Amino acid sequence: NNLCLFCSQPPKKSNDDWLLTQSALAIASFGLDGVVGVSGGEPLLYGDDFLPFIDFIIENSPDTALHVLTNGRKFADINFTQEMAKRSKKIKITFGIPLYSSRPLVHDHLVGSDGAFNETVKGLINAGNSGINIELRVIPTLANYTELDDIVEFVGRVFSNINQISLMGLESIGWARKNWSTIFIEHSSYSEKITSAIDAAHRSGIPLTIFNYPLCHLPERAWELAAQSISDWKNY
């Protein structure tokens, strides 16, 4: 339901619904005492069919924590949100949800879907107020880099249960590669905005972590907040 200009895993026409069942079986087989990431596409497009997936993990791999990447729009459905909230009390689960602007037109432009901002904001409010753990993600681009601090300020004032704000550097993969010239902004061009965003997060009492940036591209103040990303090609 989103077509982000920088989607790292562009949608395919093939039906891969079977992967949800296979993923549940694989997670249960591993029995991992750690975190497993769930992404897509958009995993919450399964709607209520996603709930049995969570139930299966709770029953068969209770020590496994889940981190689910989603655009958050499904949480605008309060009935779905309440069902997920019940399950979130039985398993360690966090939802990584992006908000790319405090302005509807900018967010909708970047995700390629009119009305996405309003639905995502409603979803974030519903999820947070229901006690669901949220990691709020922001990717700076040409369209939004000037408002990084405003986005963080907006998040701190409007939403609840935000466990972390993640500032993530744009990756040249998927649709970002073909749209690179119209969305990428040199990191050095918005160093002051990164610093201001850090200040805004501090005022809000929300931890901020930075991903996908070489330290030499960040203001020194941000170094202690930079995480070492998992892929070797990001560490240059």
Where do the language-model regions lie?
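Conserved alpha-helical substructure of the radical SAM core
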Residues: 2-68, 75-78, 90-91
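Short glycine-enriched, charge-decorated loop/helix-capping segments at active-site entrances
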Residues: 9-14, 109-115, 180-185
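Amphipathic, non-transmembrane alpha-helical secondary structure
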Residues: 20-28, 47-55, 78-85, 121, ...
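Conserved C-terminal portion of the radical SAM core fold
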Residues: 31-38, 65-67, 93-94, 118-183, ...
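Conserved radical SAM core fold
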Residues: 43-45, 72-76, 95-113, 141-143, ...
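Short aromatic-enriched loop/helix-cap "lid" or pocket-rim segments at secondary-structure transitions
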Residues: 50, 80-81, 148, 177-180, ...
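Short, electropositive alpha-helical surface patch
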Residues: 54-57, 145-163, 218-236
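Short, hinge-like loop/turn segments at secondary-structure boundaries
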Residues: 84-87, 113-115, 153-155, 182-185, ...
